[in-house]
Curated annotation (Swiss-Prot):
One function term, GO molecular function aspect: calcium ion binding
Residue ranges with Pro residues bias: 528-544, 576-592, 673-688
A GO biological process held by the record: negative regulation of protein sumoylation
Residues modified to Phosphoserine: 25, 57, 186, 275, 365, 1020
Membrane-crossing residue ranges in chain numbering: none
Listed name of the protein: Fibrous sheath CABYR-binding protein
Annotated localization: Cell projection, Cilium, Flagellum
Entry comment on modification after translation: Phosphorylated by PKA upon spermatozoa capacitation conditions.
Tissue: Expression is restricted to testis and epididymis, expressed by spermatozoa.
Function: May be involved in the later stages of fibrous sheath biogenesis and spermatozoa capacitation. Inhibits ROPN1 and ROPN1L SUMOylation. Binds calcium.
Lineage of source species: Eukaryota, Metazoa, Chordata, Craniata, Vertebrata
Low complexity: bias regions: 274-290, 448-467, 558-575, 689-720
Subunit text: Interacts with CABYR. Interacts with ROPN1 and ROPN1L; the interaction increases upon spermatozoa capacitation conditions.
Amino acid sequence: MEECEEPEEPISLGRQEYRRRRRPSQPMVDKSQQTEITEKRKAMASVQPPAPKATHSIGNIPGSKDNYSRKEYESLRLSSQLQKTLMKRKHVQDMTDKSLQTEPIVEEKVEVIFIDKTLKLEENTAGVGEIAPELPQSIPEVEIPTSRPTSHLIDRSQQTSCTGDWSLIYICPKEKVDKEQQTYFSELEIIIRSIPGSSMTKSKEETIPIAQEDPLVEINGSLEIEVLSPEELPDVMMSFTEGEISGELQALSNGEATVKGELFLTEEIPIQAPSPAEETSAAETATTTAKDVVDIQAPPADKLSSVEAPADISPTLVQGALSDKPSDQQYPQGTEMAPSELPVEDLDPFSEEVLEKVQALTTDSMLEDLGIAESTIAEETSGKVQHPLSEETSKEVPAEVHFPIAADFEESAILINEKFATDEVFEEYKPPIIEEVSADKATAEVQPPSAEDASEEVASSEVLPPSTEQGTVEDLTAEVLSTPTEEGPTEVPPQPTEEGPAEVPPPLSEEGPAEVPPAPAEEAPAEVLPPPAEEAPAEVPPPLTEEGPAEVPPPLTEEGPAEVPLAPAEEVPAEFLPPPAEEVPAEVPPPLTEEGPAEVPPPLTEEGPEEVPPLPAEEAPTKVPPSPAEKGSAEVSPPQTEEGPAEVPPPPAEEFPTEVPSSSAEEGSSEVPLPPTAERPEEAPPPATEEAPVEVLPPATEEAPVEVLPPATEEAPVEVQSPAAEEGLAEVPPPPTEESPTHDVPTEVQVPQAKESPGQVLPLSGESTAEEASAQVQPPSFEKAPLESLPLEEVEKIHLDNLPFEVQPLPTEDIAIGVPAESQALPADENPAREDTVETQPSSFEGAPIAENPIEAPLPASEADTGREDSAVHPSSLGPTDEAPAEIQILQTDDIPTEMSPVENQPLPAEEGFPEVVSEEEATAAEVRFPLSEGAPAQEATVEAQLTSVEESPKRASVDVQPLSPETPVEESPGVDLPLKTNEVTMQEFRVEKMPAEDSLPPSEQTPADQVLLKEHRLSQVADISEKELESTTLTSDKMSEGIDSVPEDVSGTKDDQISTFKIEGTIKIELKN
């Protein structure tokens, strides 16, 4: 056989192998039966016999690609039958052998192939020779195979199937192996092959390079993104920006477009679409656009300028506030290097800012279009509102950037328009101040209605600016970006869009038309506010949205307003807040609108008008107090009186009715639309909370008051306050009014939570008849909210958890802002509890401190930090709220725990931790406890938010938390008493908290994002707490990356960083930061 083999490998070998294989073929038949065994035998035998003879065979197999090829060619020379038979069986056996010998052969082949290829590359026959003696033959053939393989490869690629049978079997197996290995090694082989430049290699190489290049290019984009991502922000930007912005922008598009107007959508989406892909481009574009928008807006000057400057500035402002220069730089850079620079330069700040900015810019671009379009739309939407709307929208554009700012813009736009130079300065970053000042002034002047909205918004915006930044950034980053910033609605809409968008748009539409300014304002405010104030709420709404995206938008919108007030309240807002609070009412109407679009208008109209008047009454917020007042009429009354509740009551009554109707109706409607409520939970919780929820809750809870509460809720604070009002409602209301909005949202959120435990809430309510009423109502609300809220809230929670960071960031923001609402918003998920808590806390936090002056004193920091009259006001509310919040919180805790089992669990931790935390609280515990307390109730997010909330809460929540222990009972039983206890405890706790108060503040701000940001931003202050909290928050933060977004205005800048982080990076970023 060997002779035959030697004489003619092809013929002899063919025959002999044929024979041999025939022999094995019988075993092969058997083999088919005895597959393994026979194969092995055959393989062994075949391999072995072929080893000598098959050396050629094997040689053929490994190196014999050549030999075999030649052989086959020669075989081809042989009779076709022999060849066929041979090939068939040979292939079979070879395949079998190969399969058996695959590894060795493959290895050999691989070696050969690699070497072959290498040889091919190098053309080293020696290498081949080294591979096998056979290869010497194959050596020439190696070269030949080089050609043939090339041909074969080519053929193979072409003839994969046909020729591939044997050619492939050998070649393929070899080459396939090679290829696979090359495929795996494709890099090496590609490289190697690239070296050889074989057609295959080239093709492959080219193909791969092309593919890779594209991917690489894409990847480069991605990589850049990723690379940027290494920068965190870039990644976040890219991911966030791309996904987020895309999502957000798109979300914005959906939500915003929906909300803002298809213009927005169209404009925005384009940008959006670009933004994701282009995010950088979009960022640039957005940035450029933003700049252009600035320019363009500048042309709109009034709006765009105002807006844009604000937008730009807002971002700048916000960012400027946070990262003034970075904003600017980022802005420019954003323009140029949006992706890289954005991420790179400030990456975090920048990125976020940029993101925010980009989004802002993008938003601006969109807004630009939107602003124009929206202005148009806004204008169209509401002729009169339109301007504000437009401005607002324009602002909203900025608002989108920082809708909060948008709010400012609305106001600022107006103000800015008034103070356009300032606006320009705004651009300079003074704008922030100016904006704020303007916001303040504007708030004062705008405050009337616009002022109210604007103020609120401005305040919000203003607050938001930071908030926005946070909100925006947060929004941007968080989604809030989209949601809050983009428009809490828009984004939220996106999320809300999911629900919100429609709703948001409704708010927008409803609001837009009626409230359009509010809508925009609200949107901007809401959105803006939401972003900031609501941001947590709104954001929360987003979380809520998550929970009830749609809701979120409403929340944003609604809450935004309310929340915005919160935010504003929170920020400058405190002062503005009152207007905002009131405004929130007005704005709330939007929320109402949101909640009850139709209603909203009424509410808006009534409320808005009324509210606006209330605005003056501003503390029409009192109105909220009214709610509280209503809620806790007598009780609240004092607060109302404080707030002007009397007035408010009427307005509340009216508003209440109106608002309540609106809110209530809205809430009832919308709320009733628990679906909306569901949304509402979000919305309600946020908006509702802010308004409906709270309102509902408060109203419902309080009085059915639901309606009234709505107003109250509107001043959910009231509601929350309700409890507080109930407890110290009167007191709370005023603060509530101011804080109310803030609280409001929280309350609302709370509502959800309360909602969660209507009973509990009731117990809370029980605690105070009013409260009980509230609770009652709340239960309705809660029920409503609970139903939805619970689900939503839960969803929210989930979403929050998912979005948590966003939400949380909001909270942070808010919290930071002092709008615990935000935290609440964040909590929103937990929000309800948190919100309530937070808000209440904010109230508590602010108010509580005030309420519990001791804490307030500490809180003052928070409060100061929060910079909330709210604090002051809230303190009253807070005091009550504190108590109520405690209740609520407890409720929340209960509810939240219920709603958020996590929270619940957490609450326990909070409770447990709470004391524990309390120790820390002394150190940082307030915060920690805060988180724990509230967090426990709320959730981790809550924790985080709670950190914030709790922080605030600690003031009241702390007490609450302490009640937490009671809270556990509370949890067990709403423990109406507990709330009371809490109240009492609150005093105590507050004292303890008091120390934390400061921490609190940071914690509030510190809210996850805040923490991080705070950490950075306030790091000094918060450093310890931030750190601690951050850690705890980090989880929460990560969970609630939103928290990052939430980063208070202060934190804003940082938050921006966080923001980028916040969403995706939020966690990552946080991690990174952490």
